[in-house]
Curated annotation (Swiss-Prot):
EC number(s) stated in the UniProt entry for this protein: 3.4.21.-
Protein name: Kallikrein-12
Catalytic machinery residues: H62 (charge relay system), D108 (charge relay system), S200 (charge relay system)
Alphabetical list of PANTHER family matching this protein: KALLIKREIN-12, KALLIKREIN-RELATED
Protein source organism: Homo sapiens (Human)
Disulfide bonds: C28-C161, C47-C63, C133-C235, C140-C206, C172-C186, C196-C222
């Protein structure tokens, strides 16, 4: 009953915080991203996330709220899809190497353990972790409810998707000299297409596996020509992720 009441409150009133969203994407196919998570504080969307196990969600470390309402199986944020599941995050584990966005964006990932496991359905499913690292030129996509390029309605109601490709480490280092490490991967750089404010922690999916989490990018407008977004390179953290889940 408590979750049902909370869901009704969510669909009756929704606000979105100015934290990284999909810029110039298109509506995702319904149920095409069953691992997509929205992290809410009350009715305010704070970050994206990705379901990687029936009880674990992965998001960005800079999404620093202590407790979240975790919404899964969502497509529209303002209308009932009848596929939603709501969970409350229990405890979380931030990567011990993360020093904060003001110091370095490295190790920008955080695991959230759900108080109750999800029910796996066609609309709610975990996304596999990678066995290998995606290389330059790999075609991927990113999803979220972040800022769009529509001036009258910058915060989308419907889940947005965007296709983009992995950029070489050398190219990305040239754009962000001295700031890119081997634990980061860059994608995009096509004019007008990017993750943007509000998509933080959301998944970069390549070949049906999780390769990145939306982390950071240019301080200027989203979707600048030749300016890729920067993602936490999940292939570098698989052992740590599995250790945390196994021990908790």
């Amino acid at each position: 009953m408590g979750l049902s009441i909370f869901l009704l409150l969510c669909v009756l009133g929704l606000s979105q915080a100015a934290t990284p969203k999909i810029f110039n994407g298109t509506e995702c196919g319904r149920n095409s991203q069953p691992w997509q998570v929205g992290l809410f504080e009350g009715t305010s969307l704070r970050c994206g996330g990705v379901l990687i196990d029936h009880r674990w969600v992965l998001t960005a470390a800079h999404c620093s709220g202590s407790r979240y309402w975790v919404r899964l199986g969502e497509h529209s944020l303002s209308q009932l899809d009848w596929t939603e599941q709501i969970r409350h995050s229990g405890f979380s584990v931030t990567h011990p190497g993360y020093l904060g966005a003001s110091t370095s964006h490295e190790h920008d990932l955080r695991l959230l353990r759900l108080r109750l496991p999800v029910r796996v359905t066609s609309s709610v499913q975990p996304l596999p972790l990678p066995n290998d690292c995606a290389t330059a030129g790999t075609e991927c996509h990113v999803s979220g409810w972040g800022i769009t390029n529509h001036p009258r309605n910058p915060f989308p109601d419907l889940l947005q998707c965007l296709n983009l490709s992995i950029v070489s480490h050398a190219t990305c280092h040239g754009v962000y000299p001295g700031r890119i490490t081997s634990n980061m991967v860059c994608a995009g750089g096509v004019p007008g297409q990017d993750a943007c404010q509000g998509d933080s922690g959301g998944p970069l999916v390549c070949g049906g596996v999780l390769q990145g989490l939306v982390s950071w990018g240019s301080v200027g407008p989203c979707g600048q020509d030749g300016i890729p977004g920067v993602y936490t390179y999940i292939c570098k953290y698989v052992d740590w992720i599995r250790m945390i889940m196994r021990n908790n």
